[in-house]
Amino acid sequence: NNVLPGYIDSLDHAESTKDRIPLGRIGTVQEIAQTTRFLISDEAGYITGQNLIVDGGMTRHL
């Protein structure tokens, strides 16, 4: 499994970047960590070979 993050607040992004993201904000490191935590938990035990896109809808918007 893979976590594919979009723009994350740990990097310096232009303020206008938020305008291109359907949710209207930059993602957080905590959101990526929570997704990773889920993937390694027993709750995701039957999920295999998946790419989880965590980008606030950016990919869908393209």
Regions found by a protein language model. Give the residues of each.
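Conserved SDR Rossmann-fold cofactor-binding beta-strand/turn motif
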Residues: 1-9, 40, 53-55
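A glycine/serine/threonine-rich, flexible loop-to-helix segment
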Residues: 2-21, 31, 61-62
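Gly/Ser/Thr-rich helix-start
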Residues: 7, 25-28, 50, 57-58
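A conserved structural motif in NAD(P)-dependent oxidoreductases
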Residues: 21-32, 43
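Short, hydrophobic alpha-helical segments
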Residues: 36, 40-44
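Short C-terminal tail/terminal secondary-structure segment
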Residues: 37, 48-62
